[in-house]
Curated annotation (Swiss-Prot):
<keyword id="KW-0254">Endocytosis</keyword>
<comment type="similarity">
    <text>Belongs to the adaptor complexes large subunit family.</text>
</comment>
<keyword id="KW-0472">Membrane</keyword>
<dbReference type="GO" id="GO:0030122">
    <property type="term" value="C:AP-2 adaptor complex"/>
</dbReference>
<dbReference type="GO" id="GO:0005634">
    <property type="term" value="C:nucleus"/>
</dbReference>
<dbReference type="GO" id="GO:0044732">
    <property type="term" value="C:mitotic spindle pole body"/>
</dbReference>
<dbReference type="GO" id="GO:0030276">
    <property type="term" value="F:clathrin binding"/>
</dbReference>
<dbReference type="GO" id="GO:0006886">
    <property type="term" value="P:intracellular protein transport"/>
</dbReference>
<comment type="subunit">
    <text>Adaptor protein complex 2 (AP-2) is a heterotetramer composed of two large adaptins (alpha-type subunit apl3 and beta-type subunit apl1), a medium chain (mu-type subunit apm4) and a small adaptin (sigma-type subunit aps2).</text>
</comment>
<keyword id="KW-0813">Transport</keyword>
<feature type="region of interest" description="Disordered">
    <location>
        <begin position="597"/>
        <end position="677"/>
    </location>
</feature>
<feature type="compositionally biased region" description="Basic residues">
    <location>
        <begin position="616"/>
        <end position="627"/>
    </location>
</feature>
<dbReference type="GO" id="GO:0072583">
    <property type="term" value="P:clathrin-dependent endocytosis"/>
</dbReference>
<dbReference type="InterPro" id="IPR016342">
    <property type="entry name" value="AP_complex_bsu_1_2_4"/>
</dbReference>
<keyword id="KW-1003">Cell membrane</keyword>
<dbReference type="GO" id="GO:0032153">
    <property type="term" value="C:cell division site"/>
</dbReference>
<dbReference type="InterPro" id="IPR002553">
    <property type="entry name" value="Clathrin/coatomer_adapt-like_N"/>
</dbReference>
Length: 677
């Protein structure tokens, strides 16, 4: 370390000695060598800021290589020594008027890269002039400089009209200038909440023409920007999609995915259902090609994007399921994504191929893969009603292996199956009895407790089994305590005489002895509901819920649309719209047009209807509000002293049930599911 320190110390000394030379032209090569060593020292973490005055004085040289090194040094240390850096502004402005286009471009790039007010204020006038420079390289640098200035001071750029200049540059004769102007414009759009961008057909055609003359990075920028083109007439979207199609075969994954995004975006403006499906299917081969690459990271990204696309076209891979079979050398995160996709594309026709795969995966060594496979089998039983018996038989077969984590995951999915098909598979309950001792995870125990409460009237030992779980009530996690409380109340509503002592103890524990506010509040709510009106309590606690549904649609249409417009971005990996994890990000949506295609909730391209997601969200909230109002009625209007409360109207349940209470609660109901899981 000491030898290295002395080396960079000597470099600084050499540089100072070179600058003190009277003949600057003869010492140019030495200064270049010394500056390279100084910048190398900076990369190793050494402080070279003491050379700042000497470097600034060297900027007057006409040597291009020396200027590049001086400008690089300036960009590194300008923020460290802003006062001294201001001296360099005049020298940079002199270079902007140089006859050499490389020097003009280099000077402007430096002036817009330093986040010091004197620098970017000084850049405002030159950048307007250089936007019309005769050299395309200088114009390209000026376009990128506008985006940099916008990141420093948005109001200054917006008021100066530079953004309008940037839009005009989309008609530049140079494809490189057009692509870089577009990249700068997109950068501004993505960092602004009030800036709206749309492209005319003429501009969009020019952008497509420039694709062939651009680098891969600029091709990606152009393809990302083409979603701001809004077709206005029938046939425009199809014609435009055909022009983009050749880039589906591009070797660069980012370019290929950019083309996929544009084509799928254009399907929103196609009226013919068959053409829509045709273009969805046209994107399948490039996706499969990318999926076949050896890079696991690339595979993961493609799989995450395919999941989003399947929201719009579930049948896209229905006949090509083998692409998503797990390979022995796939990392676990790739295998899990493949299982999700297989579950999505499964139907009555391909289940004979998918179900054996899941059963095989459930016999693997990897515990996470086994759990996911068992869960997927349960989802298939819910999704494909015609073949539910085959899926349930596979679950029973797996439970017979007596592998603990298999049993626990199977119990969880059996709960969902019972909710989906109430009254159809009660024969599964005895199988659960045989494996109760194997359940030690909270989710599995909660599932069994839910079943005991939901089917208490059909399970003879339900009270005994619940009492066994109640012995360790205070040692259980909150999730199980809440489930136990709800299950005990449901058992009491169905078997009031036998469960009276049990419900008394549990409500007393929850209202008097526990510290968790959620558990205590729920106990108080149940106590008030039972004391106010037992019959209404039945209607709330034993109310029917919407049946469990495991379909293709994971998201509402608005979210799906936003994800489709953000394919091949970080949003497609998170499966969240950008505005949910990036502050100030714009919400993407399809612009209105006479040919805009309207979708239904299932987002299937073969169906059309109006976008009613907001209305459906309101209806869903309205349903919950009705339940909330019923509970408020108990809390505010129907609270009267009863055997369930003491004379001071306390919030605790402290008394025994008399015969009248038991008689009132003696008629059990048989609901499809319960309310407060």
């Amino acid at each position: 370390m000491s030898s290295s320190s002395s080396h960079f110390s000597s470099t600084a000394a050499d540089l100072l000695a070179v600058f003190s030379s009277d003949n600057k032209d003869k010492s140019a090569n030495k200064r270049i060598s010394a500056l390279k060593k100084a910048i190398a020292g900076i990369s190793y973490g050494y402080d070279m800021s003491s050379l700042f005055p000497s470097v600034i004085s060297s900027m007057e040289s006409n040597n291009l290589e020396l200027k590049k090194l001086c400008y690089l040094y300036l960009k590194i240390y300008a923020s460290v020594k802003p006062t001294e850096a201001k001296r360099a502004v005049k020298l940079i402005l002199n270079d902007i008027y140089s006859s050499n286009p490389m020097i003009r471009s280099l000077a402007l790039r430096t002036l817009t890269s330093v986040n010091i007010k004197n620098f970017w204020v000084a850049a405002m006038d030159p950048i307007v002039r250089l936007l019309d420079d005769t050299d395309p390289y200088v114009r390209k640098t000026a376009a990128i400089g506008i985006a940099k200035l916008y990141s420093y001071d948005k109001k200054m750029v917006e008021s100066s009209g530079l953004i309008d200049h940037l839009k005009e540059m989309l008609s530049d004769e140079s494809s490189v200038v057009v692509a870089n102007s577009l990249a700068a414009l997109m950068n501004i759009v993505n960092s602004s909440t009030g800036f709206k961008l749309t492209f005319s057909r003429e501009i969009s055609n020019k952008l497509v023409k420039s694709l062939t003359d651009c680098s891969e990075w600029l091709q990606v920028a152009i393809l990302d920007a083409l979603i701001f083109y809004v077709p206005q007439k029938p046939g425009e979207a199809e014609s435009f999609a055909e022009r983009i199609s050749p880039w589906l075969q591009h070797g660069n994954a980012a370019v290929c995915m950019g083309a996929v995004k544009v084509i799928l975006y254009l399907t929103n403006y196609m009226k013919d259902d068959n053409r829509v499906k045709e273009y969805f299917m046209k994107t399948q081969p490039p996706l499969v090609t990318l999926l076949a690459r050896k890079s696991s990271a690339t595979q993961y990204v493609i799989l995450r994007n395919i999941q989003i696309i399947l929201e719009q076209c579930p049948e896209m891979f229905a006949n090509d399921i083998h692409f998503f079979y797990c390979n022995f050398d796939d990392p676990i995160y790739v295998k899990l994504e493949k299982l999700d996709i297989l579950t999505k594309i499964a139907d009555i026709h391909n289940l004979d191929q998918i179900l054996p795969e899941f059963v095989e995966y459930a016999s693997e060594i990897d515990v996470e893969l086994v759990r996911k496979s068992v869960k997927c089998i349960g989802y298939l039983a819910i999704k494909i009603e015609e073949r539910k018996n085959d899926c349930i038989d596979s679950l029973i077969e797996l439970m017979n292996t007596k592998v603990t984590y298999v049993i626990q995951e199977a119990v969880i999915v059996i709960r969902d199956i019972l909710r989906k098909y109430p009254g159809s598979y009660k024969s599964l309950v005895p199988i659960l009895y045989e494996n109760l001792d194997s359940l030690d995870e909270p989710d599995a125990k909660s599932a069994v407790i839910w079943i005991l409460g939901q089917y208490a009237e059909e399970i003879e030992d339900s009270i005994t089994l619940l009492n066994d779980y109640l012995k360790g009530f205070f040692d259980e996690p909150l999730e199980i305590q809440l489930t136990l409380l709800t299950a005990v109340i449901k058992v009491f509503l169905k078997k009031p005489t036998a469960a009276a002592d049990m419900v008394t103890n549990v409500l007393q524990w929850c209202t008097d002895e526990v510290n968790d506010p959620d558990l205590r509040d729920r106990g108080i709510i149940y106590s008030r509901m039972l004391s106010a009106n037992p019959e209404l309590a039945k209607k709330v606690i034993l109310a029917n819920m919407p049946p469990v549904n495991v379909g293709t649609g994971m998201y509402d249409p608005d979210t799906t649309e936003q994800l489709m417009l953000n394919i091949s971005t970080l949003s497609s990996i998170y499966h969240k719209p950008p505005n949910r994890f990036v502050k100030g990000a714009q919400v993407a949506y399809c612009e209105p047009s006479p040919v805009l295609r309207l979708r239904t909730r299932d987002s299937n391209p073969s169906n059309t209807d109006s976008r009613e997601s907001n209305h459906k969200k309101y209806n869903h909230f309205h349903q919950k509000s009705q339940t909330r109002r019923v509970m408020e009625q108990y809390d505010r209007n129907s609270w009267n002293p009863s055997p369930f409360s003491d004379e001071s109207n306390s919030n605790t349940f402290s008394g025994k049930f008399d015969s009248a209470d038991q008689e009132n609660l003696g008629m059990p109901m048989t609901p499809e599911t319960h309310l407060m899981d």
